[in-house]
From Swiss-Prot:
CDD domains with a match to the protein in the record: cpn10 (cd00320)
Annotated source species: Sulfurimonas denitrificans (strain ATCC 33889 / DSM 1251)
Name the record gives this protein: Co-chaperonin GroES
Annotated gene: groES
Subunit structure and binding partners: Heptamer of 7 subunits arranged in a ring. Interacts with the chaperonin GroEL.
InterPro entries linked: Chaperonin_GroES (IPR020818), Chaperonin_GroES_sf (IPR037124), GroES-like_sf (IPR011032)
Entry's localization field: Cytoplasm
Pfam families listed in its UniProt record: Cpn10
Record-stated family: Belongs to the GroES chaperonin family.
Function noted in UniProt: Together with the chaperonin GroEL, plays an essential role in assisting protein folding. The GroEL-GroES system forms a nano-cage that allows encapsulation of the non-native substrate proteins and provides a physical environment optimized to promote and accelerate protein folding. GroES binds to the apical surface of the GroEL ring, thereby capping the opening of the GroEL channel.
Assigned keywords, A-Z: Chaperone, Cytoplasm
Recorded superkingdom: Bacteria
Gene Ontology cellular-component annotations: cytoplasm
């Protein structure tokens, strides 16, 4: 994929979370919350705090969902990312 975010934005691929509870109950797709974790796929030249491959935590309603090469991603302002998961 060839995509370069502009401004202070990053392109993030959501990390899918388990769809079962600890006790084994399966949660249907329409009842699941959208994941608020992801992996940075592309970074604007203005963003210095993050690198491609970083695992990040962001708000549930952050960013704009886009489809590139048949995959869903989020374009998020770097200020809407809470932190990097180490």
């Amino acid at each position: 994929m060839n995509f370069q975010p502009l401004g202070k934005r990053v392109l993030v691929k959501r990390v899918e979370e388990a769809n079962t509870t600890a006790s084994g109950i399966i949660i249907p797709d329409n009842a699941q919350e959208k994941p608020s974790r992801g992996e940075v796929v592309a970074v604007s030249s203005e963003v210095k705090e993050m690198l491609c491959g970083d695992k990040v935590l962001f708000g549930k309603f952050s960013g704009s969902e886009v489809t590139l090469d048949g995959e869903k991603f989020l374009i998020i302002d770097s200020e809407d990312i809470f932190g990097i998961i180490k």
